[in-house]
Amino acid sequence: MEKDVVSLQDALEHGLTAEEFQKIQEILGRIPNSTELGIFSAMWSEHCSYKNSVLKLKTLPTSSDKLLAKAGEENAGAMDIGDGLAVVFKIESHNHPTAVEPYQGAATGVGGIMRDIFTMGARPIVSLNSLRFGNPDEPRNKYLLSRAVKGIGDYGNSLGIAVSGGELFIDECFSKNPLVNAMTVGIVRHDQMASATTGGQVGNAVYIVGATTGRDGIHGASFASKDLSKESESKRSAVQVGDPFMEKLLMEASLEAIQKGLLIGIQDMGAAGISCATSEMSAKGKTGMKIDLDLVPFRETGMNAYEVMLSESQERMLVVPKKGKESELVSIFEKWNLNAVRIGEVTADGFIEIYMGGKLKAHIPAESLVLGGGAPRYERETKRPSYLDAVKTWKPNSILDITPGANTKDVLLNILSSWNVCSRKPITEQYDSEVGLVKLIGPGLDGGLSSIPDTNKALATATDCNSRYTYLDPYKGAQFAVCEAARNVYVTGATPYGVTNNLNFANPYIPENYYMFSECIRGMGDACRFLGLPVTGGNVSFYNESPEGPIFPTPTIGMVGILQDKKKFLSNFPKEVGIELAVLGNFRPSLGGSEYLKKIHGQVNGSIPEIDIKEELELCKLILSLNEKGALKSARDLSLGGIGIALSKTILFSGLGIDAELIAFKQSRLDLTLFGESSTTVLVGFDSSWKEKIREQTEEKGLKFYPVGKTTSSELLKLKDIGVEVSFSELNGPYEKGLEVVFAL
């Protein structure tokens, strides 16, 4: 055994605590060497071990009769969708790498989540991304956003995977710490699902396949587990470098090997690289592995064991083939011009045994390294932030109301131009949403809807979180995120199936931050339980803060749903003249946390909209029932920007006009009526012959029917009772120009 003895100071510099260093010595029965310390530091980092979050995550609902792979069991969640098929999906972050090197940081985030899907045997069919950036008027933020979007587009387009949707949210708190959350969804037959395990098959060979190994990404896992600082800019070596064309070859070769039944197990080498893949596969299979690092294909010379074990070079997999299938495995990967090299074997003793240069470099129990095994687990101290009570003292009468006529029109156009409302075309046009011929409802609308190849089914997808809401009220804000994601799925006509989450928070050792995290988990869990939605997995990203302060808490919700008959999909907007419009649900608007309050008055304040999850469930059932009966022509979520923005976007997407009267929506203030935001509300379109039946069925559910008006051929938004008339061109100008400056050549 190599004995370059390390000290407590070395451990602290690797991000371990004194207590953790002591625990490592107890596990090994000795002081670790430098390679072993590096392995423990990566595997016990927040990024890999979830040590400060796993106890909270265990409170989330994870049960469903449709589940095929529960949270934490595999690389991604898997759910039965009928006919022998499963949907496989997951969301993950690449926040800190994007802050340092936005193009590669965002691109490799896409690559990593793609590998999580196809290592399970599923072919990715759509991807989404949820982005948070600072004000693009500032040059650095503009650079980060534009380069991140290009990285996402270039990588995904090269793989040939359609983008079905996503979201962008802009706020100053994300200036030094942007968020890039990437989600991928794939489809697989039940009998072709793969697992990240050795399968207990002692003596089987272990192969590394795909790209060569270099020094890129070393310390990537630990880099993602620290606060961003002024020195972070120098940590570019911790950012991985991606090759999407290599990933495409790796995907095809891996899927071919899986479909031909050659493999016992397969694992992506993402965070912590070989360290993670060997330990996780071994622990799951209750075995060990003996690995010779001299056999690893290198792209750089002079790498030592520490560097090889911690390298996060992209587009690599660790596979355990079935005995007798090794040559066939190698032939497949060689056909795709990829490496497939035997580097070791599965052992019975449960230890990860690493050799290089003929010397034993590491000897560690696999179970001691992994989440759910020997990795530490903590529940941190919480303290309710004092500002949460202060913001609730804000009253709408502290700001001037808008007045009917020109003032209202000006405010409407101003909100339409805001970063969080305006057109996403400058972003979505960089993504290929048509590849694979699966798009039914594309990016830029409430939720995406894509055909599932060779079936009559369609897949609905959405990502959602209003970061201002969770900042103002973490419990209700997280509930709102779950409900809005579900709403954006069911307005396509699809039934919500399951949730994946990306929990973006600040330093968990600060009690106020951990309180926000805990409350968001509680809110998310309560909402998912009531809606009957299992949480199938996801990602936790702590330490999202800079010297200027923490980000807003952002528990991004990824949602999938299934429409059994894709011919019954619902449009986001009406397509004919004379269609009746109404809002179904319970309109309880609030200006607290609204886009109006931020854009027009420069404030993030107040109480966020009330939310009743029982009503949300009833509204979901109502929309799905009405659609099944053929009663609806369109449906869209009513949230950011209120009824005023929802009607404006309906005109912009349909090219029609709307004659509306908002008497049924009238509140004590005009700004509250037009721009107040509400949960549990959907704007629907229908033929007039259905009006009374829809009203009756809505009221039977304990919900309300709010008549709006009709579509016209005028291309005008007429709010008759408010005295506002706005043309398509007047709406379109500010809406389209909002993000153009960011992506202008």
Swiss-Prot record:
Amino acids binding Mg(2+) 2: 116, 268
Location relative to the cell: Cytoplasm
GO cellular-component term (any): cytoplasm
Official protein name in the record: Phosphoribosylformylglycinamidine synthase subunit PurL
Any single GO BP term: 'de novo' IMP biosynthetic process
Binding site for Mg(2+) 1: 92, 539
One family name in Pfam for this protein: AIRS
Catalytic activity: N(2)-formyl-N(1)-(5-phospho-beta-D-ribosyl)glycinamide + L-glutamine + ATP + H2O = 2-formamido-N(1)-(5-O-phospho-beta-D-ribosyl)acetamidine + L-glutamate + ADP + phosphate + H(+)
Natural source organism: Leptospira borgpetersenii serovar Hardjo-bovis (strain JB197)
EC numbers on record: 6.3.5.3
